[in-house]
Amino acid sequence: MTLEDVGERAARPEDLSRFVVERLNAGDVEGLVALYEPDAVLALPDGGVASGRDEIRRAYAALVADRPVFTPGEQQPTLVSGDLALTSVRLPGGGVTVEVARRQQDGTWLWVIDQPALPA
């Protein structure tokens, strides 16, 4: 099984935000990693950056270890230009996420850049 075989694939860029909440709540680290391109970057709460799937895997493994519960936010309008999309979600606590997704050769979408929480 490859990462691409893990969970449902994003047919629309907006699907990625829904999938991340579902997989966080399920503790599905491999399913989370499968939402990213191999060389993607993920901003970390401490100001660092996880680069590539191995570092993203470690970051999510640490995050879900305590089994926190995540609540979906309000998906903001997606901006698409060719094979790139800018997605954003307003979180229940007032913060905002910002992500860049890229359309893959099979028509599905994966994140390239993920800023999970900007201050409110």
Where do the language-model regions lie?
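A beta-strand edge to alpha-helix "cap/lid" segment located at domain peripheries
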Residues: 1-29, 41-120
